[in-house]
Regions:
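Mature catalytic domains of secreted/periplasmic carbohydrate-active enzymes
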Residues: 1-168
């Protein structure tokens, strides 16, 4: 018996998000978007998490330049918080422990976003209030504060400052 041990259902791709054993403390969805977990019959709170990588590999791959955009990673972070899940982001370090400049830049942008909007994702929990008409949008709640997350909001601008002018 080890009371300070955290048990996770990291059983591979077949058991993603499944509660399974009553002793579990957390379930993982691996690289699949989290879903609600039914805790009605659970004697305790069970955390959940989704894992993601900045590129196409879990570890360091010198020639892997297929980096995910910071916008996509931010959307995935927010999608995790929709269900109260944690977002684990991997950037494979090089042999000396440092990050490639491209990975460091992506993480830096996520850090900038979190500095601006972290209040909306750290403490708030799922509100249970549905947002009608937009499947991906959702509300989080922290006490009397609500945070609306809207996805797919295109930027419109004058043709002199945007690649695609409004209405095209």
């Amino acid at each position: 018996y080890q009371p300070d041990t955290i048990l996770i259902n990291n059983t591979g791709l077949e058991g993603r998000g499944q509660l399974g054993n009553i002793e579990l403390d957390s379930v993982t969805f691996e690289r699949v978007k989290p879903q609600p977990i039914n805790l009605a019959d659970s004697p305790k709170y069970i955390a959940s998490e989704m894992c993601e990588v900045t590129c196409d590999h879990w570890g360091y791959a010198r020639e892997d330049l297929n980096i995910k955009s910071p916008a996509l990673l931010i959307e995935e972070l927010c999608a995790c918080r929709r269900y109260g899940a944690n977002f684990l982001l991997n950037a494979g370090p090089m042999g000396d422990g440092s990050l490639r400049p491209i990975d460091a830049a992506a993480l830096g942008i996520l850090g900038q976003w979190t500095a601006l909007f972290g209040e909306s994702i750290h403490a708030p929990r799922p509100s249970g209030i549905a947002v009608s008409g937009r499947r991906r949008d959702f509300l989080l709640q922290d006490g009397k504060s609500y945070y609306l997350f809207c996805f797919g909001l295109d930027m419109t601008a004058d043709e002199h400052v945007a690649l695609q002018a409004a209405g095209e």
